[in-house]
């Protein structure tokens, strides 16, 4: 019986450690999403290897780090489009980490079913 409890405790502490590592990476994304972020940088932000980073994202969040980053950037872009204040779509795309406005348009349309221009016209 003691071995079962010990294994459960070990599993729980490993899961908590993994969650803490993911949280560190998510904070890094939130603070740096407007820059060019690599998988290696995400992993380094939590002192883990890129392969461990991939595994943790799949296990804990059910997605890849790059897909998470893309979704996060698109959500931030949507927020910024709501309060554009005269800024162009290209400027908003750049501020959210998209170096190519046409790539931003394609990603936005794929995620939300309309282009950033169509979205802005609808709000």
Give residue spans per PLM region.
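Short amphipathic helical patch at the helix-1/turn junction of helix-turn-helix
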Residues: 33-34, 82-85
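An amphipathic alpha-helical interaction segment
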Residues: 1-13, 17-27
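Basic/polar phosphate-binding segments, predominantly the helix-turn-helix DNA-binding elements
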Residues: 28-30, 36-75, 93-118
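Glycine-centered tight turns that cap/initiate beta-strands
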Residues: 11, 35-36
